[in-house]
Amino acid sequence: MGHLVLVRHYVLVLLLIELMQLLLGSLGLS
């Protein structure tokens, strides 16, 4: 169970990084 939680947390972190990059990119293009 612990391993699945770690994998889920890792995926959430990756998604947050992706969103941050999209936000920074949109601000840079504006």
From Swiss-Prot:
Lineage start: Eukaryota, Fungi, Dikarya, Ascomycota, Saccharomycotina
Predominant subcellular localization, coarse grouping: membrane
Organism of origin: Saccharomyces cerevisiae (strain ATCC 204508 / S288c) (Baker's yeast)
UniProt KW keywords: Membrane, Transmembrane, Transmembrane helix
Transmembrane segments: 7-29
UniProt-recorded name of the protein: Uncharacterized protein YKL145W-A
Subcellular location: Membrane
Protein topology in the membrane: Single-pass membrane protein
Domain of life, source organism: Eukaryota
GO CC annotation terms, alphabetical: membrane
